[in-house]
């Protein structure tokens, strides 16, 4: 093999190839599971109700189904490669070699015995030999092997179709789930990061769709090639048997001692067929291994790029959110500062603004939130004293002067900056004017 210093037999190369393919497939499936976990870990705890229905999409259930499916597929692939690695090719080749040797030995003995028999006896014996060969255990085993191979291929095909169909259904459900989350929780007015999210979402969904299409195409090609190979091998075996039959009839008419030459020709033809079948099988295995490795490397690279882009977009969204929050808090603080400056003259005695604190001193007795505020007891006491002073000075209740003086007293008490004596003096001045 180019690039390798040592020489390997066909069986060793087969074992090395299957072991490498098994490890690569195992690593690929493990990485796929890790990337899926990292991709949807943020939404695994969310629940989305489908509009106009009572259906609830739970991310946890979708994740569990995908994980179970990947584990089952991984176990099936591992068991398949273990079964292929445990195949006893050396024993089977030895048994085939023994069968061929016995066959040629019997053919040689038969050729030697033909010299003492006439044409009719030889013809009857050859017909009986052909019937015995077709009814022998080896012929039954060969037919049984072909039927079993076709049966196994059909089972593998049905299982793969069901698995791919289930994976496609789960993928479509995941796509609907992600779109429902986006429509419910993402604000479409925030154009900057929503566009980035749409791009990442389209790339991830496109990657998953390409993965499914690649698996379906690869499966169809592999199943078709394997089925064609089995059919071709079966036809070649049948053709070989028919050729042997014709050669046996040729040996019947051989009266010049050319039987040994015919036997050698048949042996060479059988060995050539065996070498051809081995070369075809090795070439198919190497070709499919290269295709699988190339596809897995391509998928791994795309997943790595998508993960990096997703992480960068997530970081950018987090930074943008923090920045927007800081801007909003600064706006609130500036609004309070402006409010303080605009109302400094009128409400400054009641409001105090500090960093992170807003204090309002209400000049009323307000014990409960569900009650209207009442004036303080001191303000009520001052109001009673001032009203009594008005009565003593001869101001009659219900008159216009009484109403004007009551309004003036309320204005004086509302300022909360004048003492009781100052208010009395102001009332006396007002009475004189």
Curated annotation (Swiss-Prot):
Superkingdom field: Eukaryota
Residues listed as glycosylation sites in the UniProt record: 158
Keywords for this protein: Cholesterol metabolism, Chylomicron, Cytoplasm, Glycoprotein, Heparin-binding, LDL, Lipid droplet, Lipid metabolism, Lipid transport, Secreted, Steroid metabolism, Sterol metabolism, Transport, VLDL
GO cellular component: a single term: low-density lipoprotein particle
Localization annotation: Cytoplasm; Secreted; Lipid droplet
UniProt keyword Lipid metabolism present: yes
Pfam name, any one: ApoB100_C
Inducing factors: Within 24 hours after estradiol administration, APOB mRNA is increased five- to seven-fold in liver but is unchanged in intestine and kidney.
Descriptive protein name: Apolipoprotein B
